[in-house]
Design a protein with these regions (language model features):
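Conserved phosphate/anionic-ligand binding catalytic regions in large, soluble enzymes, centered on
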Residues: 17-40, 140-158
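Amphipathic alpha-helix face/heptad-repeat signature
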Residues: 30-34, 62, 69-76, 107, ...
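Long, charge-rich low-complexity segments
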Residues: 79-91, 193-206
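Amphipathic alpha-helical interface segments
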Residues: 80-149, 153, 165
Length: 206
């Protein structure tokens, strides 16, 4: 089932159930898409305004990138579900099966791929939102701040879906490579999201 085609209420209802998907990864992707859309909205409210004519071309180009990014993040809701299937099947293999460990290892690495990609997309979104916050309509700057907060949350949530899998990998070299990549994104882009939030907040005298 493609949960992105369901209502918000249905998504939350299934998320709260014992269904295997959506889970944390799918939720992270959806929150990231919402955060990206909030930044994109600032662009929509900027284009066509005489006050922002000098940056209009840049904003239009940025909006096109966000359109694609929103779609890609929503696609990850389904991709995360699909990526988890091999791991779920691997855990069902009898423990005395000589191939179990190798199959489980491969499935665990596969399960890391989608949340890692969600992290990358959220980092990209936060970078775009910084531009919207700096150059977009002042009337909608709070939405840019909200978008940054959402994308930071999505980034952090996706990272946990990486770390829960790397923790169980037997190949520690591969695990540490993925951990280093994920932590690098967290360190850089959580800080940038915080900077956006604090700048927007300060603009309101807070």
């Amino acid at each position: 089932m493609d949960m992105t085609l369901e209502s918000c209420r249905k998504f939350v209802e299934v998320l709260a159930s014992d269904a295997p998907a959506p889970g944390g990864g799918g939720a992270a992707a959806l929150v990231g898409a919402i955060g990206t859309a909030l930044g994109n909205m600032v662009g929509s409210l900027t284009v066509g305004k005489k006050k922002y004519a000098e940056v209009e071309a840049e904003i239009i180009a940025l909006k096109a990138k966000c359109d694609a990014l929103q779609t890609e993040l929503l696609n990850q809701v389904v991709a995360d579900d699909i990526g988890f299937v091999p791991l779920a099947k691997a855990y069902g293999i009898p423990k005395d099966d000589p191939n179990r460990d190798a199959i489980l290892e491969e499935a665990t690495i596969t399960a890391c791929a989608v949340p890692m990609h969600i992290m990358e997309l959220c980092c990209e979104a936060i970078g775009y939102i910084k531009v919207f916050a700096d150059k977009g309509s002042r009337l909608a700057v709070s939405d840019a701040g909200c978008g940054a907060v959402c994308c930071k949350a999505a980034l952090q949530a996706a990272s946990l879906n990486v770390f829960i899998n790397t923790k169980s990998l037997k190949n520690r070299e591969v695990a540490e490579q993925m951990n280093a990549k994920a932590n690098g994104m967290l360190n850089t882009y959580c800080a940038l999201a915080d900077e956006i939030f604090n700048t927007v907040k300060a603009g309101f005298g807070q």
